[in-house]
């Protein structure tokens, strides 16, 4: 399976009504087409420190921020491939590096184990893990996405719809979402945006 491991792009994000989405789809129709996967369910498990250092920093809207997540495009089991992604944003430019691993191996690595791979992206994630120390999964976020690309695949427009579908969780029975105050370290939370 071939996949892109390094990304650099500008991201502009907007909240849209259904009517606005419809108008944008009409406007881009001559120039862009739905990607090969159509509508996709994306599941992210974000890692942070016990005091939510990464999330708190991100909320401050700094010129530089970073995050670590595990992403799946299907319901994952221990042998399913997932992506470990290190995402950094500097002055509106997003840099993303990712690697594919079986879910069980990825989770063990991200929670303090070691990884047998020796490529640059693994070393970058290892550095991130050692720098922030004791990272744990804290937020699960699932949403539906439709992505459209220009013919040259230079431009991408995507629409994401967030919801509360518990059945689409990446870890059934392991990480159950609970609503908790951000001051409760180690509590997994589900972030839900309605739109």
Model-derived regions, located:
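Phosphate-end processing signature that detects enzymes handling 5′-triphosphorylated RNA
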Residues: 1-195
